[in-house]
Amino acid sequence: MDPSLLLDQMLQDVSNLPAEFRYMLEEVGLEDEQCLELRKRYQQKEGILHKYIKQNGSLAANPKEDELLAEVEQSMAQVRELQEEKCQRANTILFLVSRHLNKLQQNIIMLEEDGLLAPAEDEMESGPDFSRESSVVGSTVSERKRKAASEDHPRRKKQSRSMSNTHREKSYNKGDDTADVKSPASTEREGTLDLQNYQEELFSSMNDNEKEDQNLYCFCQRVSFGEMVACDGPNCKYEWFHYECVNLTEPPKGTWYCPDCKQEMSKKLKKKKQ
């Protein structure tokens, strides 16, 4: 395998990412502004209610209380919806970064196995020439060394609490001119796709030629599909789980551990107490 060809392909794969990320971050910024405006709105309504109580006492009925409370609840629901959309966009960015780092890692392994690239450990021992490794690549290689259970189960860094695995394979048609490729972000700008369809198109467009996400995950040992959640256990055997396999219907709040990791942590806790 020619290293220059791998480099050219990698650069081609990531060439559209800056525009995609810029668009998604701009959308997050706009949603932040909407959230702030909605917060001001419902805080103003709450202020009216508190002012009435101060002036008339808590026992006096406010004729506008039901109307004001309904407006407060509506604004809070809109804020919650916007926050969820922001999380989806952030998860999309993190997922794409992780995906390309994983591909870069696999290319490094391939070159090392072909003898075209010295292993990372040998380079560090032979001298201070780290030109091949940026801090990101170095951390990726370390992750590979730590978690290389098998080639069928490459570990993805825990970049999000959960992610939508609608990244079905569709060709980027690499022979075409880059200018002719219409990005999912530009499609959404035209208003033809909602957020969910945008994510589906974004993930779909990545990997028909790469065929790199046929790995098996979860207790069920099936490929990724639907919603998936990452276990926060540092030594989790599977790391990613389908919602249905762990009885989840929505993203968990805070830290989440799979049943196996919970059991292992419980055993360690009992040993410490003894």
From Swiss-Prot:
Gene3D superfamilies, A to Z: 6.10.140.1740, Zinc/RING finger domain, C3HC4 (zinc finger)
Keywords, comma-separated and alphabetical: Cell cycle, Chromatin regulator, DNA damage, DNA repair, Meiosis, Metal-binding, Nucleus, Zinc, Zinc-finger
Residue positions binding Zn(2+) 1: 218, 220, 242, 245
CDD domains: ING_ING3_Yng2p, PHD_ING
Residues in PHD-type zinc fingers: 215-264
Amino-acid positions noted as binding Zn(2+) 2 in the UniProt annotation, renumbered to this chain: 231, 236, 258, 261
Entry superkingdom: Eukaryota
Compartments, as annotated in UniProt: Nucleus
PROSITE patterns listed in its UniProt record: ZF_PHD_1 (PS01359), ZF_PHD_2 (PS50016)
Biological processes annotated in GO: DNA repair; meiotic cell cycle; regulation of DNA-templated transcription
Biased composition, class Basic and acidic residues, residue ranges: 166-180
Cellular component per GO, a single term: nucleosome
Description of how the protein assembles with itself and partners: Interacts with H3K4me3 and to a lesser extent with H3K4me2. Component of the NuA4 histone acetyltransferase complex.
Domain notes: The PHD-type zinc finger mediates the binding to H3K4me3.
Family from the record: Belongs to the ING family.
Protein name: Chromatin modification-related protein YNG2
Species this chain originates from: Candida glabrata (strain ATCC 2001 / BCRC 20586 / JCM 3761 / NBRC 0622 / NRRL Y-65 / CBS 138)
